[in-house]
A protein has these predicted regions:
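N-terminal signal-anchor transmembrane alpha helix
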Residues: 20-40
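Transmembrane alpha-helical segments that form the membrane-embedded catalytic/substrate-channel core
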Residues: 35-41, 101-112, 160-171
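Cytosolic, membrane-interface loops and tails of multi-pass inner-membrane proteins
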Residues: 41-59
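Core segments of transmembrane alpha-helices
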Residues: 66-84, 103-104, 128-133
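Transmembrane helix-loop-helix
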Residues: 76-103, 143-151
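Membrane-interface helix caps and helix-loop-helix hairpins in membrane proteins
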Residues: 87, 109-119
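Hydrophobic alpha-helical membrane segments
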Residues: 97-108, 121-139, 159
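Terminal transmembrane helical module of multi-pass membrane proteins
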Residues: 135-174
Length: 174
């Protein structure tokens, strides 16, 4: 009985801690999530992409895109942290966060299902990207940094941007 109560106290404490985090603080979860995702993908994604997307996709492509992504995640987290206002959060959401996290989850999960083979990155996409994305959305919503119109339009922009980016960089379609 006492052990159950200890676990419950831990959960209550964790929930209390999370409830005190602000959007501009939580945005710092983005860079380490991105880095951990890259570490999962790095050794195997290129060969997977060459098999299922385009034989033209190279390790140099992967490294260029993802080193820029690591730098970008830090730069954009810094900008949002310094200027947590609606316009900045919307641009971050539409062009960085939603394409990089939410649509990346859909890409990796979908690719794993369609190919019936592990798509490198699916584990961190599901265990890190999705929870971090949902937390940041919830905090942005509760702090009135995103509302229904900006959330919906941001997702539409993010979906189009992610589709273009993956089509260009991974599938070499254009």
């Amino acid at each position: 009985m006492k052990k159950g109560r200890t676990n419950l106290n831990y959960l209550v404490s964790a929930r209390s801690l999370v409830s005190k985090v602000t959007f501009h603080e939580a945005v710092w979860l983005f860079p380490p999530s991105f880095i951990l995702h890259v570490l999962e993908e790095w050794p195997r994604f290129t060969s997977w992409a060459q098999r299922y997307a385009s034989p033209l996709y190279s390790q140099q492509d992967y490294e260029t895109i993802h080193i820029a992504g690591i730098i970008g995640s830090i730069v954009f987290a810094t900008i949002v942290w310094m200027f947590p206002v609606r316009a900045v959060v919307f641009v971050f959401f539409a062009f960085v966060l939603a394409p990089g996290l939410f649509f990346n989850v859909l890409f990796h999960a979908g690719a794993t299902v369609v190919t019936s083979e592990y798509c490198p990155g699916v584990i961190t996409a599901l265990t890190l990207y999705l929870p971090v994305f949902l937390l940041l959305c919830r905090l942005a919503w509760s702090e009135n940094l995103l509302n229904a119109p900006t959330l919906i339009s941001g997702l539409v922009i993010a979906g189009a941007f992610h589709t273009w980016e993956v089509g260009h960089n991974v599938f070499k379609a254009w």
